[in-house]
Amino acid sequence: GLWILTSPAEVAWYGLGYDIYGYALSAATPFILIYIFGPKIADLLPEGATLAQFVETKYGNIAQKIVSIVAVIYMGAFLIAEFASISFVFESISSVRGILISLLIAITTLAYLFRHGFKASYFTDRLQSYGIILLLVIVLTIWLSQNRLSEIVTFANAGGLSSFETFSLKSALAVIIAVTAAEVFSMGYWQRTFSAENSKAIKQASIISGIGAFLTILILGIG
Protein backbone atom coordinates (compact mmCIF):
# COMPACT_ATOMS: atom_id res chain seq x y z
CA GLY A 1 0.00 0.00 0.00
CA LEU A 2 3.00 2.34 -0.01
CA TRP A 3 2.18 3.48 -3.54
CA ILE A 4 -0.75 5.48 -2.23
CA LEU A 5 1.55 8.15 -0.75
CA THR A 6 3.39 8.89 -4.01
CA SER A 7 1.51 7.64 -7.08
CA PRO A 8 -1.47 10.06 -6.98
CA ALA A 9 0.84 13.08 -6.78
CA GLU A 10 3.00 11.74 -9.63
CA VAL A 11 -0.05 11.16 -11.81
CA ALA A 12 -1.35 14.66 -11.07
CA TRP A 13 2.04 16.22 -11.85
CA TYR A 14 2.65 14.45 -15.14
CA GLY A 15 -0.93 13.94 -16.32
CA LEU A 16 -2.49 17.23 -15.14
CA GLY A 17 -6.15 17.77 -14.27
CA TYR A 18 -8.05 15.04 -16.06
CA ASP A 19 -5.54 12.39 -15.08
CA ILE A 20 -5.86 12.74 -11.34
CA TYR A 21 -9.65 12.66 -11.54
CA GLY A 22 -9.41 9.65 -13.84
CA TYR A 23 -6.97 7.96 -11.47
CA ALA A 24 -9.27 8.59 -8.52
CA LEU A 25 -12.23 7.23 -10.48
CA SER A 26 -10.26 4.16 -11.55
CA ALA A 27 -9.66 3.37 -7.88
CA ALA A 28 -13.43 3.31 -7.35
CA THR A 29 -14.61 1.53 -10.53
CA PRO A 30 -13.79 -2.02 -9.27
CA PHE A 31 -16.11 -1.39 -6.33
CA ILE A 32 -18.80 -0.08 -8.68
CA LEU A 33 -18.57 -3.32 -10.66
CA ILE A 34 -18.70 -5.40 -7.49
CA TYR A 35 -21.73 -3.40 -6.31
CA ILE A 36 -23.53 -4.20 -9.57
CA PHE A 37 -22.38 -7.74 -10.31
CA GLY A 38 -21.02 -9.03 -6.99
CA PRO A 39 -24.33 -10.07 -5.38
CA LYS A 40 -25.52 -11.79 -8.57
CA ILE A 41 -22.28 -13.74 -9.00
CA ALA A 42 -22.20 -14.72 -5.32
CA ASP A 43 -25.81 -15.94 -5.51
CA LEU A 44 -25.13 -18.00 -8.64
CA LEU A 45 -22.12 -19.68 -7.02
CA PRO A 46 -22.70 -19.79 -3.22
CA GLU A 47 -19.71 -22.06 -2.59
CA GLY A 48 -17.37 -20.12 -4.87
CA ALA A 49 -14.15 -18.38 -3.92
CA THR A 50 -12.73 -16.90 -7.14
CA LEU A 51 -13.87 -15.33 -10.39
CA ALA A 52 -12.33 -18.23 -12.30
CA GLN A 53 -14.79 -20.65 -10.71
CA PHE A 54 -17.71 -18.53 -11.81
CA VAL A 55 -16.31 -18.24 -15.33
CA GLU A 56 -15.90 -22.02 -15.51
CA THR A 57 -19.51 -22.54 -14.46
CA LYS A 58 -20.85 -20.08 -17.03
CA TYR A 59 -18.43 -20.35 -19.95
CA GLY A 60 -16.54 -23.61 -19.60
CA ASN A 61 -13.09 -24.96 -18.84
CA ILE A 62 -11.14 -23.08 -21.54
CA ALA A 63 -12.46 -19.70 -20.39
CA GLN A 64 -11.62 -20.64 -16.80
CA LYS A 65 -8.03 -21.43 -17.74
CA ILE A 66 -7.65 -18.11 -19.59
CA VAL A 67 -8.99 -16.15 -16.62
CA SER A 68 -6.74 -18.09 -14.23
CA ILE A 69 -3.62 -17.43 -16.33
CA VAL A 70 -4.38 -13.71 -16.62
CA ALA A 71 -5.09 -13.53 -12.88
CA VAL A 72 -1.79 -15.24 -12.00
CA ILE A 73 0.15 -12.89 -14.29
CA TYR A 74 -1.58 -9.82 -12.88
CA MET A 75 -1.29 -10.86 -9.23
CA GLY A 76 2.35 -11.81 -9.79
CA ALA A 77 3.15 -8.40 -11.25
CA PHE A 78 1.25 -6.75 -8.41
CA LEU A 79 3.19 -8.76 -5.82
CA ILE A 80 6.54 -7.86 -7.39
CA ALA A 81 5.57 -4.19 -7.42
CA GLU A 82 4.59 -4.33 -3.75
CA PHE A 83 7.86 -5.91 -2.65
CA ALA A 84 9.85 -3.53 -4.84
CA SER A 85 8.12 -0.59 -3.14
CA ILE A 86 8.82 -2.02 0.31
CA SER A 87 12.48 -2.54 -0.57
CA PHE A 88 12.85 0.97 -2.00
CA VAL A 89 11.17 2.73 0.92
CA PHE A 90 13.14 0.92 3.64
CA GLU A 91 16.44 1.54 1.88
CA SER A 92 15.49 5.22 1.59
CA ILE A 93 14.75 5.71 5.28
CA SER A 94 17.22 3.30 6.92
CA SER A 95 20.50 1.48 6.44
CA VAL A 96 18.77 -1.91 6.31
CA ARG A 97 18.80 -3.67 2.95
CA GLY A 98 15.34 -3.54 1.47
CA ILE A 99 15.52 -7.07 0.10
CA LEU A 100 15.89 -8.43 3.65
CA ILE A 101 12.75 -6.62 4.80
CA SER A 102 10.86 -7.86 1.74
CA LEU A 103 11.92 -11.45 2.43
CA LEU A 104 10.94 -11.15 6.10
CA ILE A 105 7.49 -9.86 5.17
CA ALA A 106 7.06 -12.56 2.50
CA ILE A 107 8.01 -15.38 4.87
CA THR A 108 5.79 -14.06 7.66
CA THR A 109 2.84 -13.68 5.30
CA LEU A 110 3.26 -17.18 3.87
CA ALA A 111 3.53 -18.63 7.37
CA TYR A 112 0.24 -17.27 8.68
CA LEU A 113 -1.58 -17.92 5.38
CA PHE A 114 -0.49 -21.56 5.34
CA ARG A 115 -1.63 -21.97 8.92
CA HIS A 116 -4.90 -20.03 8.97
CA GLY A 117 -5.80 -19.36 5.32
CA PHE A 118 -8.16 -16.62 4.20
CA LYS A 119 -9.34 -15.83 7.74
CA ALA A 120 -5.82 -14.73 8.63
CA SER A 121 -5.65 -12.56 5.53
CA TYR A 122 -8.99 -10.97 6.41
CA PHE A 123 -7.79 -10.24 9.95
CA THR A 124 -4.48 -8.71 8.83
CA ASP A 125 -6.30 -6.66 6.19
CA ARG A 126 -8.37 -5.08 8.93
CA LEU A 127 -5.23 -4.24 10.90
CA GLN A 128 -3.62 -2.79 7.77
CA SER A 129 -6.69 -0.69 7.06
CA TYR A 130 -6.51 0.84 10.54
CA GLY A 131 -2.80 1.53 10.03
CA ILE A 132 -3.35 3.11 6.61
CA ILE A 133 -6.16 5.32 7.90
CA LEU A 134 -3.98 6.42 10.83
CA LEU A 135 -1.05 7.12 8.51
CA LEU A 136 -3.24 9.15 6.15
CA VAL A 137 -4.66 11.15 9.05
CA ILE A 138 -1.13 11.94 10.27
CA VAL A 139 0.05 12.92 6.77
CA LEU A 140 -3.00 15.11 6.11
CA THR A 141 -2.75 16.72 9.56
CA ILE A 142 0.90 17.64 9.00
CA TRP A 143 0.10 18.83 5.48
CA LEU A 144 -2.76 21.09 6.61
CA SER A 145 -0.81 22.39 9.61
CA GLN A 146 2.07 23.51 7.39
CA ASN A 147 0.04 24.99 4.54
CA ARG A 148 -2.92 27.33 4.37
CA LEU A 149 -5.83 26.33 2.15
CA SER A 150 -5.05 29.17 -0.26
CA GLU A 151 -1.46 27.93 -0.56
CA ILE A 152 -2.62 24.40 -1.24
CA VAL A 153 -4.89 25.64 -4.04
CA THR A 154 -2.06 27.74 -5.49
CA PHE A 155 0.41 24.85 -5.42
CA ALA A 156 -2.15 22.47 -6.92
CA ASN A 157 -2.91 24.84 -9.78
CA ALA A 158 0.79 25.47 -10.34
CA GLY A 159 1.24 21.71 -10.59
CA GLY A 160 -1.33 21.55 -13.37
CA LEU A 161 -4.42 20.40 -11.49
CA SER A 162 -6.57 22.99 -13.25
CA SER A 163 -5.01 22.29 -16.67
CA PHE A 164 -7.35 20.21 -18.81
CA GLU A 165 -5.46 19.33 -21.97
CA THR A 166 -6.48 16.81 -24.63
CA PHE A 167 -3.55 14.51 -23.84
CA SER A 168 -4.59 14.57 -20.19
CA LEU A 169 -8.11 13.44 -21.09
CA LYS A 170 -6.76 10.61 -23.26
CA SER A 171 -4.43 9.54 -20.49
CA ALA A 172 -7.24 9.63 -17.92
CA LEU A 173 -9.48 7.44 -20.07
CA ALA A 174 -6.61 5.00 -20.61
CA VAL A 175 -5.96 4.83 -16.86
CA ILE A 176 -9.64 4.17 -16.07
CA ILE A 177 -9.89 1.38 -18.65
CA ALA A 178 -6.53 -0.19 -17.79
CA VAL A 179 -6.92 -0.14 -14.01
CA THR A 180 -10.53 -1.34 -14.10
CA ALA A 181 -9.70 -4.19 -16.51
CA ALA A 182 -6.73 -5.23 -14.38
CA GLU A 183 -8.52 -5.06 -11.04
CA VAL A 184 -11.27 -7.35 -12.32
CA PHE A 185 -8.65 -10.12 -12.13
CA SER A 186 -7.65 -9.31 -8.56
CA MET A 187 -8.71 -12.40 -6.66
CA GLY A 188 -8.70 -10.50 -3.38
CA TYR A 189 -11.83 -8.60 -4.39
CA TRP A 190 -13.68 -11.76 -5.39
CA GLN A 191 -12.65 -13.73 -2.30
CA ARG A 192 -14.16 -11.01 -0.16
CA THR A 193 -17.24 -10.87 -2.36
CA PHE A 194 -17.90 -14.60 -2.02
CA SER A 195 -17.17 -14.57 1.72
CA ALA A 196 -19.58 -11.70 2.47
CA GLU A 197 -22.53 -12.52 4.72
CA ASN A 198 -25.14 -11.41 2.17
CA SER A 199 -25.83 -9.11 -0.80
CA LYS A 200 -26.46 -6.16 1.49
CA ALA A 201 -22.99 -6.51 3.01
CA ILE A 202 -21.42 -6.62 -0.48
CA LYS A 203 -23.20 -3.43 -1.54
CA GLN A 204 -22.47 -1.56 1.69
CA ALA A 205 -18.79 -2.51 1.55
CA SER A 206 -18.61 -1.50 -2.11
CA ILE A 207 -20.09 1.94 -1.42
CA ILE A 208 -17.81 2.66 1.55
CA SER A 209 -14.70 1.32 -0.20
CA GLY A 210 -15.44 3.09 -3.48
CA ILE A 211 -16.03 6.48 -1.88
CA GLY A 212 -13.02 6.05 0.39
CA ALA A 213 -10.72 5.07 -2.48
CA PHE A 214 -11.91 7.93 -4.69
CA LEU A 215 -11.53 10.63 -2.04
CA THR A 216 -8.17 9.33 -0.80
CA ILE A 217 -6.59 9.26 -4.26
CA LEU A 218 -8.08 12.64 -5.14
CA ILE A 219 -6.89 14.35 -1.95
CA LEU A 220 -3.38 12.90 -2.18
CA GLY A 221 -3.25 13.84 -5.85
CA ILE A 222 -4.16 17.42 -5.06
CA GLY A 223 -1.56 17.42 -2.29
Question: Which role fits each region the language model picked out?
Answer:
Residues 1, 56-65, 128-142, 209-215:
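Small-residue-rich segments of transmembrane alpha-helices in multi-pass membrane proteins
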Residues 1-47, 189-192, 199-223:
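Membrane-interface helix-loop-helix modules in multi-pass membrane proteins
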Residues 10-14, 40-42, 84-93, 107-128, ...:
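Membrane-water interface regions at transmembrane-helix termini and the short interhelical loops
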Residues 18-113, 178-179:
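Helix-loop-helix module between adjacent transmembrane segments
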Residues 56-61, 160-166:
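Helix-boundary and loop/linker segments of multi-pass membrane transporters
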Residues 67, 164-180:
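Hydrophobic alpha-helical transmembrane segments
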Residues 76-79, 83, 96-100, 104, ...:
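Hydrophobic alpha-helical segments and their helix-loop junctions in multi-pass secondary transporters
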Residues 123-126, 173, 204-211:
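Internal alpha-helical transmembrane segments of multi-pass membrane proteins, especially GPCRs
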